[in-house]
Each structure stands twice: as C-alpha cells, then as structure tokens.
Amino acid sequence: MPTKIAVLGAGSWGTVLANLLTENGHEVDLWSHNPDQVALMKRTHQNEHYLGAEFTLQPALHVTADLGQALDQAAVILFVVPTNAIRSVAEQVKPILQAHKGRGEQPIIVHAAKGLERGSELRISQVLAEVLPKELIQGIVVISGPSHAEDVATHDITTLTAASDDLKLAEKVQKLFMNDYFRLYTNTDVIGVEIGAALKNVIAIGAGALHGLGYGDNTKAALMTRGLAEISRVGVKLGAEPLTFIGLSGVGDLIVTCTSVHSRNWRAGNALGKGEKLPDVLKNMGMVVEGVSTTKVAHQMARELDVDMPITDAIYQVLYENAPIRTVITDLMKRSGKPEFDFDNASLQKP
C-alpha cells in the first residue's frame, strides 16, 4: 500500500531519495524552500544544478515550495537538509504538525543528515527530538551509510542502515526504501550511526588533502584506519556500540567518502592539498561541505570528553588555524610510539 511521504530538501540526496521512494510506488512530495528551484524542476523534470541533465524526475513525484502542502497527511517526514538548517526547518514543521494533531496517526520522522549541530554539539536526532515533542511524532529514524546520490541516481547497488531506538519504526522505514538496487539493514544504535556519519566527513577532508599532495595508497589507508579508531573512541565514549563502527554507517561510509570524487568533503580536501585557500574552496564548491563545520564541533567534543583525536586535531589546525598541511602531517608522524590496541582494556561491549 502506498505511503504518503514528505521529503524536505531538494538537493542531490533529497531529490534522489524522493525519486526512489516514488519509484517504489509511494506518494511523495519533495519540498524546497526555493520557489524558483521548484518552478525550474517542474518545467524541466530535472534537478540539473545538483544532478546534471541526465537525471530525470519520476513523473509522479510532486515538487513544491509549500511546506504545509508537503506535510499534509504525510505518514513519514524525511529531513534531507544541511545540518545547519535542520533546526530551523524543524521549527517550521512543528506548528504544522500541531495544527494536524488529532487528524490521524502521528508521522514517523526520518533524517538523512550527516553532521553535528554547531554550538550545541547535538546529534541530528537530538535536535529533532528537542524541537518536535513526542506527542507530535511516532519517533525518529536515521538512515545512513555508504551512499553517493550520483550512484543511487543511476541505480547502482547501495546498502544503508536504518537506525532507531524503536526497532519497529526502523523496520517500517526499511520496507519503504527496499528495492532491487537499494537495501537497508536495521540497527538500534542511533548514537553510533550518527557519530559515524558525521565524523567520517572530517577524515574525508584529510583523505582528499593527501591525494591533493600526491601521497599514495599506504598513506591514505593509514589515515582511514586511524581515523576510524578516532571515530570509534568518541562514539563509544558517548555510549555507542563498538560493532556499529565496523558496519555500513561506520567503515562503510568512511570508505566511500574517503575514496570518491563524488564526496564534497574529499573534493574540498583535495583542493586544499593542491594549495587553494578554504574560503575559495567553499565558494567554488557551491554546495555545503559538512565536514568543515563538523571538524570544529568534533575538536571541541574531543576536549570535553577527553578523547585522543590527533588526526581530527590536525585537520582542525589546517581549517581553522591556517596550519600548513605538510607541517601537521610531520607533527602526527613525530608523536611518541604507542600500541595499536589496548588489549587489557579492550572489549566488544561498551563500558
């Protein structure tokens, strides 16, 4: 039976997910805050700015700039806006849900954002829970994993994780997305999934910088592996399950983000490695590079949690203190020797 779904955010990922859900037979409204973008998409049946001229919108997909219309009778609300816009969009959604209260079952809230809120250091599900009270929604699900919109647009096989404190909600969302090229697994470790999704963007900036500087595969593999160790340390300290970080939303997302030219964070790092200045890089990208703001949040979080994150600290120095990339690499390599694992205190169970 078709489900009424509102997808909020008509960037590359929001558009592709809305298209996929429409392909799966659901009734989908894709919302953009920009009326001009909506008019262009309706006229051309494309989202050329984000996805090129080859990608065509499903005929049944409804694009709108009217948030109330998009949310009307929606059983699922999927947030696919940049991290820095999550709170403001949720605040626009709240009064509409309040007006709809009592009309039927509350909607499931889903988000596909990969970042942390600057200032509060909150994960995205925490931001949504703070703005949208329990009486207005069924619960919150996060979808995350190794996924570039460009690959999903061409029906490349893709697997993600649907995570929620409520497994039944995760399973409902899982069923909405599943088809012959898109597969979701469920997980109840929301903390681990969101931390992996956010912090891999920081490491991807570093991976891109190494490529821009001409470093080889050995160096990139070292960065990714030790970067995953940092992500795992902070995640477990926050209460995540260690096994999550060897799953799709951990190492899976890290691999795809650190190795692909589709990754905005990788491309930004690559440009920095080639000598471009950060303001110019961000201006030329024309799209949000989540890892830049996440680096600042992660740097502060590491201090507050007393977690060792030397790679994250090095990337912070490059982005926010104008440190030369080769200098921070040298500093990383000159650190004192230490064991790879602390087997005496290691455990597959969180402390």
From Swiss-Prot:
NADPH binds at S12, W13, H33, K114, A149, R264, V288, E290. Keywords: Cytoplasm, Lipid biosynthesis, Lipid metabolism, NAD, NADP, Nucleotide-binding, Oxidoreductase, Phospholipid biosynthesis, Phospholipid metabolism. Signal peptide: none annotated. GO terms for molecular function: glycerol-3-phosphate dehydrogenase [NAD(P)+] activity; NAD binding. It holds the Pfam family NAD_Gly3P_dh_C. GO terms for biological process: carbohydrate metabolic process; glycerol-3-phosphate biosynthetic process; glycerol-3-phosphate catabolic process; glycerophospholipid metabolic process; phospholipid biosynthetic process. Sn-glycerol 3-phosphate binds at K114, G145, S147, K200, D253, S263, R264, N265. Belongs to the NAD-dependent glycerol-3-phosphate dehydrogenase family. Catalyzes the reduction of the glycolytic intermediate dihydroxyacetone phosphate (DHAP) to sn-glycerol 3-phosphate (G3P), the key precursor for phospholipid synthesis. This is Glycerol-3-phosphate dehydrogenase [NAD(P)+]. It comes from Lacticaseibacillus paracasei (strain ATCC 334 / BCRC 17002 / CCUG 31169 / CIP 107868 / KCTC 3260 / NRRL B-441).
